Amino acid sequence: MASTISAYKEKMKELSVLSLICSCFYTQPHPNTIYQYGDMEVKQLDKRASGQSFEVILKSPSDLSPESPMLSSPPKKKDTSLEELQKRLEAAEERRKTQEAQVLKQLAERREHEREVLHKALEENNNFSRQAEEKLNYKMELSKEIREAHLAALRERLREKELHAAEVRRNKEQREEMSG
């Protein structure tokens, strides 16, 4: 029986209560129905053909034997002197100022970045406008030159026609004078 108790103690360390109950279904019956393991008791409730049922009772911490270690209380804080409190306050103030300076620095960097982006956008817009204006002026100049060249060609053809007409008239007059 002592080996059975030690086996159950080992199982309790390794298995959950449900696993313990399940493992108890196939054990050999014992005359004593109450088992004590450290800070818990296991009572056999009833035996049936389908299996056995047990009740597991945990003892409260106050009922534990003096052998078990007592819970240690949290360590007490030592009294802090006025100088230590002042140092802590100064350190906290310094941390607050540092954090505030970091936030202000981040805001300044963000504003500077926004200014740079805006400046770049304006510069690109101005460049685009200037390029569009230059392109338009070039097209207008080219169109003007083509128009002037076309007009000059028309004038030249008109002058040639007038010269030809004058020559034809002269030739006609000469023929009339000769024939007539």
Swiss-Prot record:
Q: Which residues carry this modification: Phosphoserine?
A: S50, S60, S65, S68, S72, S73, S81
- Positions where lipid (S-palmitoyl cysteine) attaches: C22, C24
Q: Which residues cross the membrane?
A: none
Which segments of the protein form a coiled coil according to its record?
76-179
One cellular component term from this protein's GO annotations in UniProt: growth cone
Keywords for this entry?
Answer: Cell projection, Coiled coil, Cytoplasm, Golgi apparatus, Lipoprotein, Palmitate, Phosphoprotein
**Region called Disordered, residue ranges:** 59-82
The GO molecular function terms of this record are: tubulin binding
Major subcellular location class: Golgi
Q: What is stated as this protein's family in its record?
A: Belongs to the stathmin family.
What protein am I looking at?
Stathmin-3
